Amino acid sequence: ASPVPSYYQLHVPFLIWMSDNYRETYPEHWKNAVDNKDKNISSSSSFFPTMLSLAGIETPYRDDSQSVTAPHYVLKPRVYLNDHNEPRPLDDLGMKKQDFQMLEKRNIKY
């Protein structure tokens, strides 16, 4: 982790691919993923819950509110884990003006 990240460290694409057979077997996962596709998804907090959901793995650690294949996906404020392993809000990191402009250009909420 960097003490002060740049836009390029924060903007990580989140891709999901489902086969035709999977989409036919689990149409609710496909529908929810499509419904959530334009939301401001945080890949770091959504990847693990989404993979557990897609695989049908039940565990007390699974948080479906962070799964993009769940009907009740909840947007949370974005945070960055700094070099002291502490979550910090993006607007409190001392990022450059250009980084915030790029976040806004890509419609990434913070």
Feature locations, PLM:
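Catalytic domains that recognize anionic headgroups
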Residues: 1-110
